[in-house]
């Protein structure tokens, strides 16, 4: 078991748990939180419901079990408008350290929490995370520095479609309008877009189109890996306080 810092894409990790960083007002509009929103839309919908009910508070961890991953939402902001606070990050790290063994977590992938949109200097984040995570035993810990063109299974799925004999046959199923779909395919084939973050920045393509693309690619990836499951009823589910 080990602690390691890597450069890559957190969503390519094989860890059983992935860490997302969230505010407590129901917005996932930037950075890694936006990626989690697009890749795990059911989790996002439940997160919004719980925020509306004022369930989330800063400095706590809220877990959500997706089809094949445990997602840990670290509440390191109160409102998205304001910076993260190092005391909230450390409070979450202490909770994780106190409860990960009881929860049976033997591998986890973190981003550098609060360093991108949280407004906290990276060196402060690194010192705090190393202090709390390096001593932990019986667990594989990966901390990711994001590389926008590193391997990403979702982008790989898009590449397979773009370079297939007839990529247009997927257009209707994708839910993406034809002109935007063609732009996306051309960007992948021409290598002007080398990752999902670059796809998101293609001129003229809006957030709703990108959301449709993520849903489609996620479904394609699940089907290709035999991970398709019936949609679960989340009407009676809320994010679970990690320490419970």
Q: PLM features: residue spans?
A:
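Macrodomain-like recognition of ADP-ribose-binding/processing modules
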Residues: 1-244
């Amino acid at each position: 078991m080990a602690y390691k810092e890597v450069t890559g894409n957190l969503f390519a990790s094989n860890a059983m748990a992935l860490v997302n960083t969230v505010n407590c007002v129901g917005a996932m509009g930037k950075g890694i939180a936006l990626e989690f929103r697009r890749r795990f839309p059911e989790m996002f919908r439940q997160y919004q419901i719980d925020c509306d009910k004022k369930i989330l508070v800063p400095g706590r961890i809220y877990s959500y079990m997706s089809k094949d991953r445990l997602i840990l939402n670290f509440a390191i902001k109160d409102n998205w408008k304001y910076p993260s606070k190092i005391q909230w990050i450390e409070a979450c790290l202490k909770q994780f350290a106190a409860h990960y063994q009881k929860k049976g977590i033997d591998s986890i992938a973190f981003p550098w929490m609060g360093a991108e949109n949280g407004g906290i200097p990276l060196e402060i984040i690194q010192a705090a995370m190393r202090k709390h995570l390096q001593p932990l035993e019986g667990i594989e810990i990966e901390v990711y520095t994001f590389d926008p063109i590193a391997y990403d299974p979702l982008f790989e799925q898009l590449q397979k479609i773009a370079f297939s004999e007839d990529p247009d046959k997927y257009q209707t199923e994708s839910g993406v309008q034809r002109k935007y779909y063609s732009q996306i395919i051309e960007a992948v084939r021409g290598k002007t877009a080398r990752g999902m973050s670059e796809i998101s920045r293609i001129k003229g393509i809006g957030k709703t189109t990108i959301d449709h693309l993520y849903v489609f690619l996620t479904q394609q990836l699940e089907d290709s890996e035999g991970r398709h499951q019936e949609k679960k009823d989340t009407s009676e589910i809320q994010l679970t306080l990690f320490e419970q």
